[in-house]
Regions:
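Generic N-terminal segment detector
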Residues: 1-15, 22
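Condensing-enzyme catalytic core mediating Claisen C-C bond formation in acyl metabolism
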Residues: 3-7, 27, 32-34, 211-272
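Active-site-adjacent elements of ketosynthase-type condensing enzymes
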Residues: 41-51, 107-111, 190-216, 258-272
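Active-site pocket-shaping loop/turn-to-helix segments
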Residues: 11-16, 62-81, 127-136, 154-169, ...
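Active-site-proximal alpha-helical scaffold in enzymes
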Residues: 76-88, 140-141, 145-189, 227-248
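Conserved beta-ketoacyl condensing-enzyme motif
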Residues: 6, 21-23, 27-159, 188-197
Length: 272
């Protein structure tokens, strides 16, 4: 089995839109949770979310890519730009040996909601021909592959909250068995919309706290649900010997991955 290392990382997050910004904010204890600003909240039990702020996709992407993409794909492309740039794999790895595994729990939900509203208001003939390509759950992976000319395996995993971890783990396995030399992998989400917040809120999954510092409390007896967030995280994984041979900076090594299902309930964990 091949050894697998990390040679690039990039992110768009509620506390920073680059790895450097994110790291500094994380170590400083910055909280990315605040009152939802994207829409009015007259009937919502949940009023807080972790929104991406001060985000300028034009700093990394051209206007055409931005115009044709849902926000979740834009986040993914920007994070991938940073990760791939850091890794230096373009021109150093055969394009046929570069794969993309970028997943999303829901996909282009902003596009889904806006085009549904457009159809109800203006009729079916006014639905954008870009609706389906912008909305589908594999378009972030596909767009990333096109953007970098990556011609290896391209798969979009969807495993709810575990999506990014699944994509990274499966990318690790792909390199382990020799299916690729390098993998651009991770996940992206952009679902802070009225419908998504209402849906998660009404299933009592979201925190109803009004204090941002007391809203997200995992593994705490005071916990009351999760806080909706958004953004993207992307890694470049590479076969160890190849990374060493080209003098790449190695950030970390992936040494294991596994996945199971308790086959118990859609949302509740197995109590045993």
């Amino acid at each position: 089995m091949n050894r697998v290392v990390v040679t690039g990382a990039g992110c768009v997050t509620p506390i920073g839109n680059s790895l450097d910004e994110f790291e500094k904010a994380l170590y400083a204890g910055k909280n990315g949770i605040g009152k939802i600003t994207r829409f009015e909240l007259p009937d919502y039990k949940c009023t807080l979310a972790a929104e991406v702020k001060d985000f300028d996709p034009a700093a990394r992407l051209d206007k055409n890519a931005i115009r044709k993409s849902d926000l979740y794909t834009i986040y993914a492309l920007c994070a991938a730009e940073e990760a791939v740039g850091m890794s230096g794999i373009i021109g150093r790895v055969d394009p046929e040996e570069i794969g993309v595994y970028i997943g999303s729990g829901i996909g282009g939900f902003n596009t889904f909601c806006s085009e549904h509203e457009n159809m109800l208001k203006n009729g079916a003939r006014r639905v954008s021909p870009q609706f389906i390509p912008k909305m589908i759950g594999n378009i972030a992976a596909g767009s990333t592959a096109i953007h970098f000319g990556a011609k290896g395996p391209c798969i979009a995993h969807t495993t709810a909250c575990a999506t990014s971890a699944t994509a990274i783990g499966e990318a690790y396995r792909a390199i382990q068995v020799g299916a690729a030399t390098a993998m651009i992998c991770g996940g992206s989400e952009a679902t802070i919309t009225p419908l998504a917040v209402a849906g998660f809120g009404n299933m009592q999954a979201l925190s109803t706290a009004t204090d941002p510092d007391a809203a997200s409390l995992p593994f705490d007896k005071r916990r009351g649900g999760f806080v909706m967030g958004e953004g993207a995280g992307v890694l470049v994984l590479e076969e160890y010997e190849h990374a060493v041979a080209r003098g790449a900076e190695i950030l970390a090594e992936v040494v294991g991955y596994g996945t199971t299902c308790d086959a118990q309930h859609i949302t509740a964990p197995d109590p045993t």
